[in-house]
């Protein structure tokens, strides 16, 4: 088995999908989890205005709507959380995503004050954060807020990780990568677009250039620039297609060096890191 085949298998990726079937699969997955653990009353998700959180948010609200109708349990809710750092440049996209999702509840937590306070505390301890590490601080502050909300609403935190993100480890460890349940896991980027199109999402929310937008020195830096490969390259790789050797090597190098991000903390029983 080639490394490409191993990666495809590990991430559960498929070369082709039926959008309606995958929508149903994710919604049923969320519903089943909530029914298995009836003490869970809420799904909590940060909404950025990008493709992934828009899709995950819509699926969460669909699952909650169906469960309430089927069980009569009105205590169930989906909580969409806006987590800007100061003023977000694409705030209108966030509002458009909220309008599309129609969440039960919307909370806004501006993380800038908390991030600056943390940065100052570290500075006083003799640690000056680089712009890149400050970006990770933002991602972790966002996740901290979501877990606080989940803790106070008997909830779980929903993630947006999918195959095209997992393969490169393009997430912050214990930031946006630290979640309870990931309904998009298995899909590549273009497949996520297919689901949103089938759901009637406004096109500009999934046709915009994806960006983590964590760095102050490089605001709205496109993911594809940071990664050195395009999402079309990554999707083609996950669909088992042949790519130029250098492109495939770049993707595989990302996968291998970020393996620790896709695993629990390393113990004496692990040996994957010895490769």
Curated annotation (Swiss-Prot):
<feature type="binding site">
    <location>
        <position position="173"/>
    </location>
    <ligand>
        <name>deamido-NAD(+)</name>
    </ligand>
</feature>
<dbReference type="GO" id="GO:0005524">
    <property type="term" value="F:ATP binding"/>
</dbReference>
<feature type="binding site">
    <location>
        <position position="211"/>
    </location>
    <ligand>
        <name>ATP</name>
    </ligand>
</feature>
<protein>
    <recommendedName>
        <fullName>NH(3)-dependent NAD(+) synthetase</fullName>
        <ecNumber>6.3.1.5</ecNumber>
    </recommendedName>
</protein>
<keyword id="KW-0547">Nucleotide-binding</keyword>
<dbReference type="GO" id="GO:0009435">
    <property type="term" value="P:NAD biosynthetic process"/>
</dbReference>
<dbReference type="GO" id="GO:0003952">
    <property type="term" value="F:NAD+ synthase (glutamine-hydrolyzing) activity"/>
</dbReference>
<comment type="function">
    <text>Catalyzes the ATP-dependent amidation of deamido-NAD to form NAD. Uses ammonia as a nitrogen source.</text>
</comment>
<feature type="binding site">
    <location>
        <position position="52"/>
    </location>
    <ligand>
        <name>Mg(2+)</name>
    </ligand>
</feature>
<dbReference type="InterPro" id="IPR003694">
    <property type="entry name" value="NAD_synthase"/>
</dbReference>
<dbReference type="InterPro" id="IPR014729">
    <property type="entry name" value="Rossmann-like_a/b/a_fold"/>
</dbReference>
<keyword id="KW-0436">Ligase</keyword>
<keyword id="KW-0479">Metal-binding</keyword>
<dbReference type="GO" id="GO:0004359">
    <property type="term" value="F:glutaminase activity"/>
</dbReference>
<feature type="binding site">
    <location>
        <begin position="46"/>
        <end position="53"/>
    </location>
    <ligand>
        <name>ATP</name>
    </ligand>
</feature>
<feature type="binding site">
    <location>
        <begin position="260"/>
        <end position="261"/>
    </location>
    <ligand>
        <name>deamido-NAD(+)</name>
    </ligand>
</feature>
<dbReference type="InterPro" id="IPR022310">
    <property type="entry name" value="NAD/GMP_synthase"/>
</dbReference>
<feature type="binding site">
    <location>
        <position position="189"/>
    </location>
    <ligand>
        <name>ATP</name>
    </ligand>
</feature>
<comment type="subunit">
    <text>Homodimer.</text>
</comment>
<dbReference type="GO" id="GO:0008795">
    <property type="term" value="F:NAD+ synthase activity"/>
</dbReference>
<keyword id="KW-0520">NAD</keyword>
<feature type="binding site">
    <location>
        <position position="180"/>
    </location>
    <ligand>
        <name>deamido-NAD(+)</name>
    </ligand>
</feature>
<keyword id="KW-0460">Magnesium</keyword>
<comment type="pathway">
    <text>Cofactor biosynthesis; NAD(+) biosynthesis; NAD(+) from deamido-NAD(+) (ammonia route): step 1/1.</text>
</comment>
<dbReference type="GO" id="GO:0046872">
    <property type="term" value="F:metal ion binding"/>
</dbReference>
<feature type="binding site">
    <location>
        <position position="165"/>
    </location>
    <ligand>
        <name>Mg(2+)</name>
    </ligand>
</feature>
<dbReference type="InterPro" id="IPR022926">
    <property type="entry name" value="NH(3)-dep_NAD(+)_synth"/>
</dbReference>
<feature type="binding site">
    <location>
        <position position="160"/>
    </location>
    <ligand>
        <name>ATP</name>
    </ligand>
</feature>
<dbReference type="Pfam" id="PF02540">
    <property type="entry name" value="NAD_synthase"/>
</dbReference>
<dbReference type="GO" id="GO:0005737">
    <property type="term" value="C:cytoplasm"/>
</dbReference>
<keyword id="KW-0067">ATP-binding</keyword>
<feature type="binding site">
    <location>
        <position position="140"/>
    </location>
    <ligand>
        <name>deamido-NAD(+)</name>
    </ligand>
</feature>
<comment type="similarity">
    <text>Belongs to the NAD synthetase family.</text>
</comment>
